[in-house]
Structure formats: structure tokens, C-alpha cells
Swiss-Prot record:
PANTHER family: L-AMINOADIPATE-SEMIALDEHYDE DEHYDROGENASE-PHOSPHOPANTETHEINYL TRANSFERASE, PHOSPHOPANTETHEINE TRANSFERASE. It is an enzyme of class 2 (transferase). This is L-aminoadipate-semialdehyde dehydrogenase-phosphopantetheinyl transferase. One of its GO terms (biological process) is lysine biosynthetic process. Its EC number is 2.7.8.7. The gene is lys7.
Length: 258
């Protein structure tokens, strides 16, 4: 079954180069949503939180062909967003959101449901900026425990070790988010295999279907990976799909405002 995938991106630094309260969409929020945004100390964090609310609403309203005002987003106990009205067995509209460094993305698709609950059916997405997480040269060693011996060897043997580190990291995070357990799960238990690593490392910008596969608890996922250049910095995006999905395209829609 071929799936149309919606991939939306908003660069909050470009879209809203002013303080949060001057953003027109801020006034469209409910009182509780505004209070949620106002709790953030830094404007970048507040803008990403605002964009996350709006981009999910925009995505679901597009998929359901309704007004954004009609969309009600809920979250699971683990914090995974969903829209109850988008659950229409034998299919559901599933989506996942991620943000980093002022960039907010959401990916969604209509997927076949699984009443038996015996196989993964959800999408997971993660974005990360490819830059050191600390000033110390040995900062990667602090994260060695989340990688298998083969994965760690791949990181350390590569001339682009920081890229391989973040590629593996974002693939594992995408799987955990597909499962709806986030970092409460153990990334070490996710085994990632790259199929197009050289193309990812040697391209300035690229989007690759089935760039990797991952196995967790006996289940398998395909991972599409996108390498984006934003604000002169490299970002990696991993999107995890159930393996029976056939993806039609790899395009992103960049939103200038919401």
C-alpha cells in the first residue's frame, strides 16, 4: 500500500524574528496553551513550543480536510500526540513532531491500523543539529552506553565520526518516538543498520528513502533520512515507518507562518 506522507517544517527564527507575544498566531491559542508558552524563559524555546502546537493542528486539518479550529490534539500518558478523530479503522492518520535549534518539523501519513496490536503501526521522527554537545574533545565517550559495539566501532572508525554519531542517535530516537516511549526506553536495545551511509556523508543536502533499518524487540522499521543545511549548519532528520509502508515521495513543505 502506497502512503502519501506529509512533511512540514517551520524555521521559527526566519518566520518570527521578534518576541513571542508579537506573533499573530499567539492570540489564536487557548488560555491554557498561552500559559504553556509563557512558562518558557527563552524566546527560542517558546517559539518552538508555539510552532509545535500550530504545525500539528495545521497538519491534521489538512489531512482531515477541516478547519484547524476543529482539530483537537491529545497526548498519551507518555506524551505522544494523537488526534482521536483521525482514527478511522482500518486506517489511522498518525503523526509525530520534533524540534531542535529553532526548527520544528512534523511528519504524518494515513497508515493501516492493526487491531491485534501485534505489530508497530506508528511514525517516529527526530531532528538534531550536527554539532558537539560539549566543549571537551572526548564528549562522545559519555554516550557510548547507548550504542552497540558495532555501532560504536562505526562511529570511531569514520572520518566523519560526529555525523555518524548523530545519524545513529536520531535513528534510535525516531524509533523510541514511534513506540511512544521516548528516552524512557533504552536506545542500546535498538540496532540500526545503514544502507546508504556514504551517500549521506558525502552529500551536502540529500533525502534518502530506506537509508537505514532498525530492529527493536523483534520488530523492524525502515528509516528515511534527510540531511538539511539550515543557518549554515547541518541537521539530520530521521523518520521511522513500519516496514510494510511504501513511501511515494520525499518532499518537505516549508511553512513561513502559521
Amino acid at each position: 500500500m502506497k502512503q502519501k506522507v506529509y512533511r512540514l517544517l517551520i524555521d521559527t527564527q526566519e518566520a518570527w524574528p521578534f518576541e513571542r507575544t508579537r506573533i499573530p498566531s499567539f492570540k489564536k491559542l487557548s488560555d491554557s496553551e498561552r500559559q504553556q508558552i509563557e512558562r518558557y524563559y527563552f524566546d527560542m524555546d517558546a517559539k518552538m513550543a508555539l510552532a509545535s502546537i500550530l504545525i500539528k493542528r495545521h497538519l491534521v486539518s489538512t489531512a482531515l480536510e477541516c478547519s484547524p479550529n476543529e482539530v483537537q490534539i491529545s497526548v498519551t500518558k507518555a506524551g505522544r500526540p494523537y488526534c482521536q478523530s483521525a482514527h478511522c479503522p482500518p486506517i489511522i492518520f498518525d503523526f509525530n513532531v520534533s524540534h531542535y535549534g529553532g526548527i520544528v518539523i512534523v511528519v504524518g501519513a494515513w497508515l493501516p491500523s492493526d487491531p491485534s496490536g501485534m505489530r508497530p503501526i506508528n511514525i517516529g521522527v527526530d531532528i538534531v543539529e550536527c554539532k558537539p554537545l560539549a566543549f571537551e574533545a572526548s564528549w562522545m565517550e559519555d554516550f557510548m552506553s547507548v550504542f552497540t559495539p558495532c555501532e560504536w566501532k562505526l562511529i570511531k572508525s569514520s572520518i566523519s565520526s560526529i555525523d555518524v554519531f548523530f545519524l545513529l542517535w536520531t535513528c534510535k530516537e525516531a524509533i523510541l518516538k514511534a513506540l511512544g516511549i521516548g528516552l524512557s526506553g533504552n536506545p542500546l536495545d535498538i540496532v540500526v543498520t545503514f544502507h546508504k551511509l556514504n551517500e549521506l556523508l558525502n552529500s551536502e543536502e540529500v533525502s534518502l528513502r530506506r537509508a537505514a533499518t532498525a530492529v527493536y524487540s523483534g520488530y523492524s522499521w525502515d528509516l528515511e533520512i534527510h540531511k538539511l543545511i539550515l543557518h549554515s549548519s547541518t541537521f539530520y532528520v530521521s523518520v521511522a515507518f513500519p516496514q510494510d509502508c511504501v513511501i511515494m515521495d520525499l518532499n518537505w513543505e516549508t511553512l513561513n507562518d502559521l
